[in-house]
């Protein structure tokens, strides 16, 4: 445990009283189970599972079938306890508080054997007045109740009508009634994750002492007035005033870089008080705005605020303040029924390019700063500008949002309600009110957060009747829905934060949903709001199966993670596609067969007899399939941004499902557990590029669109080439010299009937040739090289097995992989792998159209040339047969 005294940033003079001491109770505690047969040290913040693993009482919970083997841990009731001395004289302070930033989840709290309160919500901060019970030496206990048992009890107590779903699908091997507890919803299992409803103190816990007044929270909300064309900052400070007399004083705000300093007089009455201040930014000073990644800088301004209060109390805080505006534009579109649905940042329409974020681990104490940095940097490295924090996980750590601010990642923030109906008893709603108020105040200062969304998929679940409720009861469930998301959550958001939009659900029809009583008649409409779309049976190479929607905030296909990732949590008997382990790890019903179905549409299944080799080959093919499917779908959304076809289009967002993994298993992720890039993530780096040529066929005609995320028009040259699979030398080249791609638009650059294309390249047929194309300026490559297959690759003719050799050299902190192919044929889907060595390549999963190629490797931890050489392997499609 550590003492943190909150010293002022400026030195106090005579008679000045510094803010009181803050004593962290982080560190070593004790944890014991219900019958005291187990007692062991436990680290706080932390979880029971982590303590048991750390002391050798259990294996890695993710190993093989341990999610089932260790179910007993979540069904037991655990107690955390500690003793501590306070390093200050308690008689000198008017108030002493015990503060928990996060308790997971249901616990009775005993301070010196006195029950001071209970917790039942993982997502809120708890503060307890211990002034009258604190001693020089103190004991603290948290008696947890099993979250599984609590949820079951709450469900049984709800006798009027069922609140489905009662239990998850059997494939998920999860627990029931998660909608009755304010806990990470996926901790009871999901279709990509295990069931580990653990118990623990998952965030900081501390003792705070103070006199006169205490600053509980402080927020900064920059607002732009279009009429005056000036910025103001709305500052909100929440105080706990312990003085029985009114407390006067002065607050001074300083932003040196903006030449802004302002002083205001304030007076605080006894009790919980909120002070709101407006700081006007000088109009003669240029304010640099915060921009999403790829659109500008993430400029922030160092700001200090000093509260000089009666009694000599001075409280000074420092923060970085960012200026940006966000608008959700829903307005009529020429040539289309319905309304637009897109975001303007600082007045500029922005196409949302990115993915969906889930918790990075079942145990948040394992999510380090380094891991968050790695995962979020990987999103930026793949040219993403948006992540949707999905509503079945957690409101992320402070550091997550700070990193998003710094990296320019826009955050679509769900509230934590997902794929379920929820109760609306007074106690439940009161807990939700505290949760939402706390989270909005915690997060609203972050420029990265651009929208609040009330829930994940609960509107569509009601309308389509996912849970088979009796139609006669639908009115009851709709009333509960409106009570929770509109009358409770929405009202709090509108009162706490007027700077960003709110939608009640995702997907939603936006204002159309509102006018239809919050449950839209057609939540799958392509002409309003956002959409979630999944189709595992239609041919994913056929772009016509995808919806030409306004914004697609979920879509995806599964794949298996790398063998090196699985190897850490399995053993040799598990290494086949049909093993018990493979079936156990797949939590999506029929998921393994769905992957093979998509693979077989365009590829032959592996033919090697070695079962482990066949397993590795199948893993590889699922990653190829996933990458190619999502490439096709994403490129369709990208090229639909500037057109209306049959009343549909103006697509302004593509957020595929999902970015990251919670454990080592088949899922929709592009980043494996721990951060290793799947093939999809390398593809995303290309298809989310700022300037991209997109090729496709329609009614026998081959088109190339130019898609731009740039802020100005660019004259470019489009080069289209046809190659035989058997030769890297292009047979034909078509060049368009006068292509001017307009800023922020998608436009046709090239079109030609495929029959004419093949006729002009006389030695080409659909089966023997492939098309590549790229944009350039003055012989400089200006876009990724893209490609279009003229046939399924299982029908392709002329492919030759390639023996690709590598020479590795070190260049500073990087490594250069010089690749050389033994054949002059084109090699599809070349996959470079260095096993478990952390890092990523500059490119991967590519078509090798040159005999020699250099690729960079960026290590995430120190490594050596010899380690890389030993771990290196290369796989291509031709190696499988």
UniProtKB/Swiss-Prot annotation:
Subcellular location: Lysosome
Record key words, sorted: Disulfide bond, Glycoprotein, Glycosidase, Hydrolase, Lysosome, Signal
Main enzyme class: hydrolase
Any one GO molecular-function label of the UniProt entry: beta-mannosidase activity
Alphabetized Gene3D superfamilies for the sequence: Galactose-binding domain-like, Glycosidases, Immunoglobulins
UniProt catalytic activity: Hydrolysis of terminal, non-reducing beta-D-mannose residues in beta-D-mannosides
Disulfide bonds: 167-176, 540-629, 732-761, 764-769
Glycosylation sites: 35, 77, 89, 113, 226, 297, 302, 803
The EC number(s) this enzyme carries: 3.2.1.25
A GO CC annotation given for this chain: extracellular space
Hydrolase found in the keyword field: yes
Any single Pfam family the record assigns to this protein: Ig_mannosidase
Main location: other
Active-site residues (renumbered): 457, 554
GO biological process: glycoprotein catabolic process; oligosaccharide catabolic process
Signal peptide segment: 1-18
Residues holding substrate: 190-192, 456
Pathway note: Glycan metabolism; N-glycan degradation
Family: Belongs to the glycosyl hydrolase 2 family.
Subunit: Monomer.
Record's function text: Exoglycosidase that cleaves the single beta-linked mannose residue from the non-reducing end of all N-linked glycoprotein oligosaccharides.
Protein name: Beta-mannosidase
Protein's organism: Rattus norvegicus (Rat)
